[in-house]
Amino acid sequence: MLVAKVIVPVPLDKTFDYIVGEKRAEVGSFVKVQFGKRSYTGLILELRNLTEESEYKLKEIADVLELEKIDTKTLQFLQWVSEYNIIPIGMVFKYLLPIGLLDSSSREIKTFKYSNDKVDNLTQKQKQLLDFFKENKDYYFSENDIKKNLNIGSSVVKTLLKYGLLEEKSEKVSSIDYNFNVNNVNLNTLTDEQNSVLNQINSHVDSNEKTILLQGETGSGKTEIYFHLIYNYLKNDNDNQTLFLIPEIALTSQLIDRFNKQFNSSIAIWHSDISNSKKRDIWLGVLNGNIKVVIGARSALFLPFKKLSLIIVDEEHDSSYKQVDNGCYNARDMAVLRAKINNIPIILGSATPSLESIINTENGKYKKVELKNRFGKAILPTIDIVDLKKEKNTILSKFLIEKMKEHLGNKNQVLLFLNRRGYSPIALCKECGHKFLCKNCSCALTNHKSKNKLICHQCGYSIDLINYCPSCNSKDSVIFYGVGVEKVEEEVKKIFPEKHIAIITSDTMLNINLMKSTLHDIEEKNIDIIIGTQIITKGYHFPDLTLVGVLDADAGLFGGQFKAIEYTYQSLTQVIGRAGRGEKVGEAVLQTYSPENIIIQALKNNDKCMILEFDKQNRELMEVPPFGKMAVLIVSHDKEYDLIKKIKEILRVFPVDSNLEILGPTQTIPYKLNNNFRYKIIVKTKNNINIQKLIKTVLEKVNLNSVKIKIDINPYNIP
């Protein structure tokens, strides 16, 4: 009797046996199976002949889907992702095939827009949704946008529609032609330096050195090299496919325009915001080999490529490649793994490479090529440092204001960078010290003045802004500490009332169309001043942007994270690099309370080596990645007593070993999230220890049914 080991998309780290019967099934085939009371699409991992009768009554595969089968290399990749990150194989399968994707056949998507607010007695969620539409009344949003940004379901949308508060529009979703014609390509000519780097990459690949770090200054033209590589691989074999990973999908609009212009063809874009029917088209096109190029966020790494020949990871240092929900993994590292399994080249590009990648070039695992000059006549911005200790509690220093006047007077654009969002981070009572905290989490609520609300940035809980203290009843006693984006906007409007301002944060850029519209306004010079947070550091090119002001250069330096030095240097280098990318000369102003700090000085002097050595010494001393292995176990439960009891049980199982260090348990930040208490255990080992095997062995000895546990191998941040 032929039996198939089938991966089922459930959060269990095991496969399930099904009888094949008379059906034609192969390893890698997609199949329909009954699991419990539900029907799922599964994936055959292995076939074997069962000679003896099973102690369980096996079910038969219901159907074998008429789809291309997954190759053995992709199956091996899924297994390695599961084992390395300690993620159940069923969850990893859902990365490859999200549940319900193949059921999506609709060619129509409904979007909604604000109509009016002439109805009283709305519920809190109905009012929240209506406020959202009112604040963005010029834009249509899909149910997917609403769910993603507000966690509000379709029933609330339908109620507002029934009341006549929203207007509805149906859009046909066309099946885009992704045909790629290598004879219809019009690539830009490379500079001598770019051409030299391209030749170096090809030489390394010919020598079977296929993992390559491309370090290039901001604005040096790394993307042009990517395009030439893509063209070469597609030209060499019509069946070849390439994957271009980017950290933020908001980056795609400029990148897609450049690609379409040079390749004269549409490109498949993969990210969470596209409709299920479009995802289905792309997924099937990748599986059958019709789609040749995919640009996407980290989830695109799990697409079922038929013949993947090249992977490019742009901004390889970016923390957005790290997934921290529904299984933790680093898409950059998993991309390197997939390239290794497929024996194909992978290019890791960045102006500010991660320390891990630099160490890998030093020990010979990766090869490194460099672009040292900006493209064309562009030069790196000059940098001035302002000591905020000499200023009078102002958001914008006198020096920065004068620089803004100078650049705006020359009809150029200014970017103000803030490492926060919201209006002011903390609301409290000046009389009794009461802090306004989220009822679900242990987080301080953030003041969003434009919405007149205090909002939790963890779970989305909000309350109306009040002028009295609910603890001591003092009136007009609520004060706010800290500076946020809205506060900066308020200050800028006072000084430059006639200038047009755009705010680019993860809060304001609610979907890709809104981001595209804002970027278009900037490119058309309808915007004078951009105020942004981390999202604005990512690879944007604005030729008329000549001044960058960093309002809080110290932010992130003293937060206790072991990667704080690297993160701060990377984000500031990237945002400074937005200035002067065209023919105009750029300037940057760093406002700081620590002007003598080694990172601030290294930025001013463009001294990468100083930062690198300083960071290496610190991490080597602490024995943290890449000079040791680390994992964080976050254990949670809605009852704190039961949680602590279970954590003690876990700790007792860890062996005593000189190569092993256990830190904790300690409360996470935030300590309470979505009504669950959370503690963390940090596991540190020498590099020669198999940390995954150690953790799995420990957890197998403990009954974890009563608690939730999240495992993060090589964490980016420790909560």
What are these regions (language model features)?
Residues M1-S350, E362-A378, D657, N674, ...:
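Accessory, non-ATPase domains that flank or precede helicase/AAA+ motor cores in DNA-metabolism machines
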Residues I7, E620-P625, T668-N674:
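Short, flexible, solvent-exposed loop/turn segments with mixed acidic/basic and small polar residues
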Residues Q79-S82, L130, K134, L161, ...:
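Short, amphipathic alpha-helical segments that act as regulatory/interfacial helices
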Residues K169, F417, H448, Q591, ...:
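Solvent-exposed beta-strand sheet faces enriched in polar/charged residues
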Residues K608-L612, D642-L663:
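Short amphipathic alpha-helix segments
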